[in-house]
Amino acid sequence: MARPCFKLEKDHPLPLAGVDEAGCAPLAGPVVAAAVILDRGRFPRGIDDSKKLSLEAREALHGKLMRQARCGVGMASVEEIDALNIYWARMLAMVRAVEALGFDPAFVLVDGNRCPRWARPSKAIVSGDARCRSIAAASIIAKVTRDRIMAAHAGDFPGYGWEQNRGYPTPDHRRALRELGPTPLHRRSFGLVREVLAESAQPMLASAAE
């Protein structure tokens, strides 16, 4: 299958930033977005949708992109996710990622079907991380950044397996959540976390009634 290329980018003005995020589905941790401006004459080979790359390939490309491209990273915290909902938190992280570039790109391509509410010239591209090289590069920066954050927090909250599952709702994470309860990094607005919190409150409510 063909890798992402510049075909869908060539009709837009430069400098062009590709934007993508990582971490909408997890039960814990922030959502992280990245904005990347590639030098079309000098960029790492092998750029692809981060989901299609091995851990080793992502890490290697992350290092090369940080050296050879202009990269900005933005995040929305767990508190912001719970206050805004994941959709708007994702948009907020993208806005922050572009702002983190330090200057205004001439055009922005965003992965997905909708751009943030901003005045920037931009376009949303469905499956952009599989089609546009700049968005694919952003997917790598966002994914590796978020994975590192969750791996670092794994030592603070042992037992949840974040060094492996990165906060996603894997069977081991779901089991740990039920057995150990939520941490401050769990998203209270997400269904399973809400369910566990409600279950843990029931015995307390019963004893209070007695």
Locate each region found by the language model.
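RNase H-like, Mg2+-dependent phosphodiesterase core
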Residues: 1-210
